[in-house]
């Protein structure tokens, strides 16, 4: 009798779920889930990726998977967004009109400011909300022993053959969290809870990883921020110099001048560092591993080493970075997937060999 009652309860709950998905309430629910997807739905085995990806990652999706961010992290990216938008608003209200109607042809500087500002904002959004190169989960599943024990050989590094005996060895490693053999230069991000191709670092300012598919947008964002600050500084300096009443009559110009001068340096230092790294085909993780330090690599003495990925010249390396295809999105948030797709399944955590031995 208990078994029959359980079956009837399950059938009733299933029918209720089907009714919910076919009623008017389901349309509202689906709309809000499309608008903001905070948690994945365990009851839905198929559908778009943005519905299932939150089950196996720390991502939050917006507008049907078109934008993403990481939950649980400090919202520093909101401060960066305000730092981009607020100067443009103040410049548009108090400065643009006066510079536009001068006799000496300062319209070009106004146009340049808005042009580089748009590039800065667009590249920031692209860097912060796009797929950095997330690798699919549960591709290389081993036959787990008792108590979900991973075989010991899965904790070994595999060295790949290279065409050069001078450069360092290329190794691949098994990720017990994502359960895949990671490709070279890939790494697991504990903040996002995903493995990322050509993982450079997790940037707290954009709340996203910087990897193969968004590194170029990150560089464009830094360059756009630098040029926008320089042009804003120039425009405000011209306004102050041309003001007949002195600096007291243009307080907003002085405010923007100080702001542009202060916000120029950090992006400039960061951009210089990453240009050197990209020009040598080296990631931040590889650089930190080479110097054996976890400190801020921007202020560390540069140590140039042999690199199998180096194309031989700065221009070739930069061209390879900026012009090569970004590669496919292996775990697309907008494409549908079928029921039983293991890439979107949150499997029981496997224990390490060492942990089992202690037990």
UniProtKB/Swiss-Prot annotation:
Q: What Enzyme Commission number(s) apply to this enzyme?
A: 2.3.1.225
- Kindly report the protein's main subcellular placement as a broad class: endoplasmic reticulum
Chain segments carrying region Disordered: 1-21
Q: Could you say what the effect of mutating residue 218 to S is?
A: In ERF2-2; loss of function
Matching InterPro entries, A to Z?
A: Palmitoyltrfase_DHHC, PFA4/ZDH16/20/ERF2-like
Q: Name one GO biological process term.
A: protein targeting to membrane
Listed result of changing residue 173 to E: In ERF2-1; loss of function
Q: Which residues form the active site?
A: 203 (s-palmitoyl cysteine intermediate)
Q: Which residues lie on this side of the membrane: Cytoplasmic?
A: 1-75, 126-217, 272-359
Q: How does it sit in the membrane?
A: Multi-pass membrane protein
Q: Which residues lie on this side of the membrane: Lumenal?
A: 97-104, 239-250
Localisation per UniProt entry = Endoplasmic reticulum membrane
The reactions it catalyses are:
L-cysteinyl-[protein] + hexadecanoyl-CoA = S-hexadecanoyl-L-cysteinyl-[protein] + CoA
Q: How is it modified after translation?
A: Autopalmitoylated.
Bilayer-spanning residue ranges: 76-96, 105-125, 218-238, 251-271
The record's section on Pfam families has: DHHC
Q: Where is the DHHC domain?
A: 173-223
Provide the function of this protein. Answer: The ERF2-SHR5 complex is a palmitoyltransferase specific for Ras proteins. Palmitoylates RAS2, which is required for its proper plasma membrane localization.
Its family remark reads: Belongs to the DHHC palmitoyltransferase family. ERF2/ZDHHC9 subfamily.
Q: How does it assemble?
A: Interacts with SHR5.
- Name of the molecule in the record: Palmitoyltransferase ERF2
Query: Which species is this record about?
Result: Saccharomyces cerevisiae (strain ATCC 204508 / S288c)
């Amino acid at each position: 009798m208990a078994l029959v009652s359980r079956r009837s309860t399950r059938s009733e709950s299933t029918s209720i779920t089907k009714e919910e998905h076919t009623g008017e309430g389901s349309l509202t629910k689906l709309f809000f889930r499309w608008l903001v997807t905070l948690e994945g739905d365990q009851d839905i085995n198929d559908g778009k990726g943005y519905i299932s990806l939150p089950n196996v990652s720390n991502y939050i999706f917006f507008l049907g998977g078109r934008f993403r961010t990481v939950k649980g992290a400090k919202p520093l990216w909101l401060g960066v967004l305000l730092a981009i938008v607020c100067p443009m608003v103040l410049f548009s209200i108090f400065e643009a009109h006066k510079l536009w109607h001068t006799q000496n042809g300062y319209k070009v500087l106004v146009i340049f400011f808005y042009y580089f500002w748009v590039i800065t904002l667009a590249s920031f959004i692209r860097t912060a909300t796009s797929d950095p190169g997330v690798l699919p989960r549960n591709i290389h599943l081993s036959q787990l022993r008792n108590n979900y024990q991973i075989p010991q050989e899965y904790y070994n590094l595999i060295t790949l053959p290279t065409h050069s005996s001078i450069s360092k060895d290329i190794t691949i490693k098994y990720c017990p969290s994502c359960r895949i053999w990671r490709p070279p230069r890939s790494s697991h991000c504990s903040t996002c809870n995903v493995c990322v191709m050509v993982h450079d670092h997790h940037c707290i300012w954009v709340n996203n990883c910087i990897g193969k598919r968004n590194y170029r947008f990150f560089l464009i964002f830094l360059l756009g921020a630098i040029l926008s600050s320089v042009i804003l500084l120039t425009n405000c300096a011209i306004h102050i110099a041309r003001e007949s009443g002195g600096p007291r009559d243009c307080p907003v110009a002085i405010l923007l001048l100080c702001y542009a001068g202060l916000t120029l340096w950090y992006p400039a230092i960061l951009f210089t560092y990453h240009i050197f790294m990209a020009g040598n085909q080296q990631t931040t993780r590889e650089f930190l591993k080479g110097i054996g330090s976890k400190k801020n690599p921007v202020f560390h003495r540069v140590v140039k080493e042999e690199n199998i990925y180096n194309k031989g010249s700065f221009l070739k390396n930069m061209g390879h970075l900026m012009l090569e295809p970004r590669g496919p999105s292996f775990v697309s948030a907008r494409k549908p997937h079928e029921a039983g797709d293991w890439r979107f399944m949150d499997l029981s955590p496997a224990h390490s060999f060492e942990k089992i031995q202690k037990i």
